[in-house]
Curated annotation (Swiss-Prot):
Main location per the UniProt record: secreted
Source superkingdom: Eukaryota
Organism: Felis catus (Cat)
Protein name: C-C motif chemokine 17
Disulfide-linked positions: 33-57, 34-73
Function: Chemokine, which displays chemotactic activity for T lymphocytes, preferentially Th2 cells, but not monocytes or granulocytes. Therefore plays an important role in a wide range of inflammatory and immunological processes. Acts by binding to CCR4 at T-cell surface. Mediates GM-CSF/CSF2-driven pain and inflammation. In the brain, required to maintain the typical, highly branched morphology of hippocampal microglia under homeostatic conditions.
Keyword Signal: yes
Tissue: Expressed in thymus and also in spleen, lung, lymph node, kidney, small intestine, colon and skin.
Length: 99
């Protein structure tokens, strides 16, 4: 009887530790950070969208997404990057024309 209680206690502790490990691992899901910025020119016609990296990242970045699904990290302070973001915003959310 004592060994059955010990076995149940061990299984309970093992199950609890697996739950904690699984929950801790899930906190980083979906977080993408840039380590460096791309310095070259990016043709506008190859871009499908953009997003800003999480505030949890050490380096603030704008990430452009290409038609092939690639992510390109860019400096949000760069003038070309700002113009590209404005362009993408204008084609994604066109301003209604007055009649």
């Amino acid at each position: 009887m004592m060994s059955l209680k010990l076995l149940l206690l061990v299984m309970l502790l093992l199950g609890a530790s697996l739950q904690v490990t699984h929950a801790a691992r899930a906190t980083n899901v979906g977080r993408e950070c840039c380590l460096e910025y791309f310095k070259g020119a990016i043709p506008l016609r190859r871009l499908t969208g953009w997003y800003r990296t999480s505030g949890e990242c050490s380096k603030d970045a704008i990430v452009f997404v290409t038609i092939h699904g690639k992510s390109i990290c860019s400096d949000p302070k760069d003038t070309r990057v700002k113009k590209t973001v404005r362009y993408l915003q204008s084609i994604m959310n066109p301003v209604p024309q007055e009649s």
